[in-house]
Amino acid sequence: MRIIYLISTVLLIYTNATVLRTKESIQNKVTYDKYGFQPLCISCTGLISVASFFLKFDVSEPVILEFATIVCKLFAKQPWAVCDGISSQFRDEFFYVFRRLANESPSQICGIILPDCADPTDPSESGWMVALPPKPKRTRISKKKVQKKPNMSMSQNLNVLQLTDLHVDFEYKYPSEANCDDPVCCRVSVSEPKKAAGYWGSVGKCDIPFWTVENMLSHINKTHMIDMVIMTGDYINHVDWEYSIEEHLSVLRKLHRLVQNTFPSTPIYWALGNHEGVPVNSFAPHSVDERFWPTWLYKEFQTMSGPWLSEGAKDSLLKRGSYSTQVMDGLKLITLNTGFCEVTNFFLYLNQSDPDSSMSWFVKELFESEKKGEQVYVLAHIPPGDSECLEGWAFNYYRVIQRFSSTIAAQFFGHDHLDYFTVFYEDMHNVSSKPISVGYASPSVTTFEYQNPAYRIYEIDPYNKFKIVDFTTYYADLEKATEDKKPVWEKLYSARQAHGMDDLSPLSWNKVIQKLFTSEKKREKFYQYAFRNFSPQCDSTCQMQLMCNLRMGHHNSTLYCPTF
């Protein structure tokens, strides 16, 4: 055995997928100092060399883990409980993966994880390409054939509710400290907190209490007519150093029961988020040992979405965490497991090439819909252009969107907790080319970190290729809520009104981007929407990243970013 858990320390310090949640990936962290060196690459190879020395002298795994915990404590500046918990969580996974990379040199291993440190060798096959079929003769579906299912309302347009990134914390305490030194606060009761946690939640390093989610769903049920609910992942809190399968199942079942009871006759579709993994971000493909397979999780999601899925869809969910289902005549919904693009899903570094054939399956489902003249909604958690998504997966996803842009009516994402959208182009390397599709990243329910809770409702025209006519985002200002005064859920904005749009076509969204890039006033309003009327410390780097997201469908370069 020539490789180590120590590399995990580099990842814990430099990626956003862990408790540190820096909002920047290791892919964007490789920089040069004034002498032309790459400190992160040097640190990576240095740690692996140290580990090789340890292992050469048969140092035991527990000792290596303890050393990794110490390094985590010193460099990541996290409490012992956090570093020790992460070490325990990832122990088996790390040793399993890195033992199988034993024949690779330190520079090759660092090149796998940090692309800008890349060695010419690519043992993980990150440059894989999914096969795309030629375009067939298109058959048009008649408007007369489009009929709502009995469980849908008979209104002209349909209302689709999106809830994402709930991150419910069943250990939320009131009163408690909201400004603590731990990665997640509002969990420890204190008599005199420096900053007291609010009863309904606290905007900051805190997740949302269960009773606030109950309040939100009750409000939605009383206020809106909902025809379909889409859940785009991350239902578990951010205390990922304490994750367990038993606790995950308990949270998922409580949340499923609440949502199901709120909308007993409404179709509800659930997607997996990276925080559903145990350890966090861990989604083992079937190419690794069976003991790592997240079968327990896939089975639970079978139960959660069960009433609305066919047996074939359930089988697909159990195989890859993804499924497709016929929502109504002329409309298919495809739910993708983006755990297979997660940059800290370490199993992928053994082989990134189409884990569990998910991308090939995605293409097959789209091709079938294309031949039938159907429209498709894509439901997933991590947007492909997010820094937490591997470029190999993002690049192939973008290619699929290009090929099937006339079939894909909309893409729905979560993950970033912020409110934004991404335009996809006919040429992924040229933002002056034709806009062909839009991905919607919906705002989170959780307040982690530093935004008010929100939900979104899309207005859909079922008689015009299931196009999104408009959407409205609602939020609650938790600073105005008290123990005796419930949150007020109110309209934040509607897309067409806020951005002065004639429609929500890719071309119209591209025009919105152009306006945002040239108008500081419009950008300020956009930032306000992104954080739901909360004033965070969003500096110039933060603001630039939000603008880059608008055209960042993958990670090719910074050409997507504005130059203001």
Swiss-Prot record:
Binds 2 Zn(2+) per subunit. Belongs to the acid sphingomyelinase family. InterPro entries: ASM_C (IPR045473), ASMase/PPN1_MPP (IPR041805), Calcineurin-like_PHP_ApaH (IPR004843), Metallo-depent_PP-like (IPR029052), Saposin-like (IPR011001), SaposinB_dom (IPR008139), Sphingomy_PDE (IPR011160). GO terms for biological process: ceramide biosynthetic process; sphingomyelin catabolic process. It is an enzyme of class 3 (hydrolase). It is found in: Secreted. Its cofactor is Zn(2+). PANTHER family: SPHINGOMYELIN PHOSPHODIESTERASE. It comes from Caenorhabditis elegans. Pathway: Lipid metabolism; sphingolipid metabolism. PROSITE patterns: SAP_B (PS50015). It catalyses: a sphingomyelin + H2O = phosphocholine + an N-acylsphing-4-enine + H(+); an N-acyl-15-methylhexadecasphing-4-enine-1-phosphocholine + H2O = an N-acyl-15-methylhexadecasphing-4-enine + phosphocholine + H(+). This is Sphingomyelin phosphodiesterase 1. Its main location: secreted. There are two types of sphingomyelinases: asm (acid), and nsm (neutral). Only acid sphingomyelinases have been found in worms. Does not require zinc ions as a cofactor. Glycans are attached at N151, N221, N351, N430, N556. Gene3D superfamilies: 3.60.21.10. Zn(2+) 2 binds at D234, N274, H381, H415. Zn(2+) 1 binds at D165, H167, D234, H417. Sphingomyelin phosphodiesterase (sphingomyelinase) that converts sphingomyelin to ceramide (N-acyl-sphingoid base) and phosphocholine at acidic pH. Displays its enzymatic activity when secreted. May play distinct roles in signaling. Keywords: Disulfide bond, Glycoprotein, Glycosidase, Hydrolase, Lipid metabolism, Metal-binding, Secreted, Signal, Sphingolipid metabolism, Zinc. Residues 1-17 form the signal peptide. It comes from the Eukaryota. Its EC number is 3.1.4.12. GO terms for molecular function: acid sphingomyelin phosphodiesterase activity; hydrolase activity, acting on glycosyl bonds; metal ion binding; sphingomyelin phosphodiesterase activity. GO terms for cellular component: extracellular region; extracellular space; lysosome; membrane.
